[in-house]
Amino acid sequence: MRGRPKLLRASSVLTVPAAVVTPAPPPTDRPLTVGISTRNRRDVLLRSLRSLRHVEPLTDRVIVFDDGSDAPVEPGLREALGEDAPPRLSVVRHEAAAGVSAGRNRIAREARTPWVLYLDDDAVLLSPDAVRAGIAVLERDPAVAAVAFPQSDEGGRLLPPGAQPSAATEPSLVRSFIGFAHLVRREAVLAAGGYREVLQINGEERELSLRLLDAGHRIVYLPDAPIAHLASQAGRDLNHYLFQVVRNDVLAAMLNEPLPLAVASVPVRLWRYFPMRRGWGADDPGGFGRIVRALAEALPRVRRERSPVRWSTLREWRRLAQSPPYHPPDAP
């Protein structure tokens, strides 16, 4: 039976400049930080936090990013978790919603470990096995920047192939991970500039994955290492989701594609709004106009942050659609 953990307090994401944060090195036997972003889903968050007992021996800290929840997450969190509370738990609160991307970046800056496991608040660990397998890949192969996991139900049964990072049935190289649960090499993510905060949520993992690929890194999918994704619909709005998906797809092209490709692809990506709206049965009056206005407002930021990837990176991105088998380097 564990003693009651200390719940650390942290202030707004804007309080401490990242440049002055120099975390002390962690114990070598605890190489993992777990980061969870949450907003207005306390019960779901509690379930996810309780599942972290599976990786407690590996974990240096658990950092919860409270993304402007109407009722702050921190008060009473330890009491609600009881003896299931992670021993080294901290809560970082942003008073206004900033988005998952900002939360993950803050977690990466706060962490002091080589590996960071990001979980959605509705993701649940079923055992330590998936995380241990992912850490083993990162430890053995310095070219790997991220490990993708398959989605499962609470019994460990895999969701359909279309809901996975790949249809592969063996360890494979893939384009991207799914944000619900992914393990990253912290230094690689920070060196790439982290998540694009302008995207907030939806498509942010694919955008980061492309930049990691452009930097020479690889992403490995482990199809036999499931993590449960008990997707919660709380707080979800179909029209807003449609807005985010289309806007972010266009923004990612504007930020990352070579100019000739962006000129051709941006109108196509923008026009996808209409078949998506019909296919989803969304009643979204004025939705297309909102997307266009949001893109216009983002143009100054796009001009500042735009950094096109290489054509060779885009060719490799297309090749990775086939999910070629992953062969780890020979052990020294």
Model-derived segments and their meaning:
Residues 50-59:
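Short, acidic, metal-binding catalytic loop of nucleotide-sugar glycosyltransferases
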Residues 60-68, 92-94:
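Short beta-strand/loop segment that forms part of the nucleotide-sugar
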Residues 66-77, 124:
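A conserved acidic beta->alpha catalytic loop
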Residues 94-111:
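Glycine-rich, basic loop-to-helix element that forms the pyrophosphate-binding segment
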Residues 116:
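Short aromatic/hydrophobic "clamp" motif used to bind/position activated sugar donors
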Residues 124-159:
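Conserved donor NDP-sugar-binding/catalytic core segment of glycosyltransferases
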Residues 181-184, 188-193, 198-226:
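A short, conserved alpha-helix in the catalytic core of glycosyltransferases
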Residues 261-332:
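Non-catalytic, C-terminal membrane-associated alpha-helical segments of glycosyltransferases
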